[in-house]
């Protein structure tokens, strides 16, 4: 479980992940814009729904789930909605998944996603939804998520970043 005191280390991990794993998919301008659409939503930590994977005192992964309406973004992202979802009608959100580039494709993201889905199910949700970066789509597809909508996030600087809204029914 992530704690508020972990925030500085989480931010470093997020920056490493964005710069290391998204670089093959995005231009430099899009990478800069990604920082606006991604990052840490501290509400997840306050809600105790955000997790970290720590290996030898190094954060190698983080992510979580949410029962709030905001689908993606950080504290600074426009159009946030911290109102609660209805588990009987809405999908829980899988949020802010980041892996250290040196630990990519070693099961860290899968571990965090599985914990988030399990916790969402315990909270009464029957499905999960997330907003995937181009780098994450294949991971989520491999775990049963289905692409529902392609969006282009337009940053304040005018750069457009392609993302995919995905959904999964929990078993």
Regions inferred by a protein language model and the residue ranges of each:
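Conserved acetyl-CoA pyrophosphate-binding loop and the N-cap/start of the following alpha-helix
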Residues: 102-103, 107-115
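Hydrophobic beta-strand residues of extracellular immunoglobulin-like
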Residues: 49-52
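Conserved acyl-donor/pantetheine-binding loop and adjacent beta-alpha core of acyl/acetyltransferases
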Residues: 54, 62-104, 119, 153-162
């Amino acid at each position: 479980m992530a704690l508020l005191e972990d925030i500085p280390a989480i931010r470093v991990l997020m920056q490493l992940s964005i710069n290391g794993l998204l670089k093959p998919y995005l231009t430099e301008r899009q990478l800069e814009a990604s920082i606006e659409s991604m990052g840490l939503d501290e509400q997840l930590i306050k809600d105790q729904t955000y997790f970290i994977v720590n290996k030898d005192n190094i954060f190698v992964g983080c992510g979580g789930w949410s029962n709030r309406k905001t689908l993606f973004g950080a504290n600074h992202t426009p159009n946030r909605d911290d109102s609660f979802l209805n588990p009987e009608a809405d999908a829980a959100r899988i949020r802010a998944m980041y892996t250290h580039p040196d630990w990519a494709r070693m099961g860290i993201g899968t571990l965090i996603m599985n914990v988030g889905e399990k916790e969402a199910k315990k909270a009464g949700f029957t499905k999960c939804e997330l907003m995937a970066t181009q780098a994450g789509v294949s991971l989520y597809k491999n775990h049963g998520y289905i692409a529902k909508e392609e969006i282009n996030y337009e940053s304040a600087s005018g750069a457009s970043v392609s993302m995919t809204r995905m959904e999964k029914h929990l078993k």
